[in-house]
Amino acid sequence: MSGHSKWATIKHKKAATDAKRGRAFTRLIKEITIAARNGGDPDGNPRLRSAILAAKNVSMPSDNIKKAIMRGTGELEGGQIEEVMFEGYGPGGAAVLVNVATDNRNRTVSEIRHAFSKNGGNMGEQGSVAWMFERRSQIFVPIEKATEDQLMGIVLDAGGDDLRNDGDQWEVLSDPASHDSVLKALESNGIPVVDPTIAWVPKNLMKLEGKNASGMLRLTEVLEDHDDVQSVYSNFDIDEKELEALSQ
């Protein structure tokens, strides 16, 4: 298990136990609104279906979900939200992708660049690090909700191609084209899922330790706490014990 995967597990715990739950609401409302631009029916819109499921997992009221969908379809007025991907490097040279949803691109560019420079990194040009990642369907399942053999059979039959034990969760990976079929297969078998998404998964990992490791985690948290940031991806790898100590 890579340090980056372990960090994803730690983030899920933090989101469920502290004030960051409010930030999760904000992010998911934006995601639902953006996804609904391609249709308000989740049965015909896999991205919207995944966003609604993630929203229900954090107990978002159904009225909030409905209004976010209506803003996306144009039935309700709302600010124009633009999706932008920023690229850069963190401490130790780790590659970083920052996915944002903003109503003011110029403001967000300035603030994200400042976050990089203030925390030992630097923002790069478009295409500078994206090639180090690949688009993958990523679905998490609580470890106690299914056995490896049970999951493997369901996932492989539905088009999934990788299953990883991340400690407290199973990480199910597949080609983006199989995302919806894998998600539906898990649901139809009564297996609860967490944060189903199409993610940027690093092709190779970069080992970090000491000041570079602590600096990278600080940069990651600063970026994730920004109001416009939807998700942050990186190829860092930190020893599990060091990562747990730094995350206390």
From Swiss-Prot:
GO terms for cellular component: cytosol. Its main location: cytoplasm. InterPro entries: Integrase-like_N, TACO1_YebC-like_2nd/3rd_dom, TACO1_YebC_N, Transcrip_reg_TACO1-like, Transcrip_reg_TACO1-like_dom3, YebC-like. It is found in: Cytoplasm. One of its GO terms (molecular function) is DNA binding. GO terms for biological process: regulation of DNA-templated transcription. This is Probable transcriptional regulatory protein Acid_5948. It comes from Solibacter usitatus (strain Ellin6076).
